[in-house]
Amino acid sequence: MKQLALRRTARQPSPLKSARPTSRAIYNSQFTIHNSCRVGRGNDVHRLAPGRRLILGGVRIPFEKGPVAHSDGDALIHAICDALLGAAALGDIGHHFPDTSLQWRNASSLLFLRRVRRLLGQAGYTIVNVDATVGLERPKLAPYIPRMQKKLAAALGIRPAQVSVKAKTGEGLDAVGQGEAVRADAVALLAASRP
């Protein structure tokens, strides 16, 4: 059904040409969604324990506790890896870097991020941007965020302006709020680098 708009004038209203094409194929082609953009979401959480190193976004943060994990336990990078892998439908971090493998024991999560970047390139995707949030009661992360952005951007081969990192507390409510855990959530946008 063709929709018409009416022109308001002092005279009698007259029909305007429809902005909608008459051919259904032409109309549908204007709204065809190509798989050129993909969105992924990732999250990670680690219990904190005394005597462990706290590393977030590839940055060592002085603190008396750190994550209990097979690798370095960088929850921020783990969430970003999952978001990127999910956007490209390439599985998850556990599939690519299993905690049952000695190869990844105490490994730097920046290595994971570089490998994920390579996988994305092989699959025909480029990273448009990453947006992440870290939940940690203390220490305050604001002073470390610019360094995190630079390290993450370097590992991903993008500009720091394409990486957003935010920090939140748990307001004393859950395991994060009680200072017992660190949590990270991330969203990533990919673009197809080839048709």
Where are these predicted regions, by residue range?
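RNase III-family endoribonuclease catalytic core
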Residues: 34-146, 155-156
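Pyridoxal 5′-phosphate
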Residues: 165-169
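Short acidic capping loops at alpha-helix termini that bridge into adjacent secondary structure
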Residues: 159-162
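C-terminal edge-of-domain segments
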Residues: 176-195
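Generic structural marker for isolated residues within well-ordered, non-membrane alpha-helices
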Residues: 149
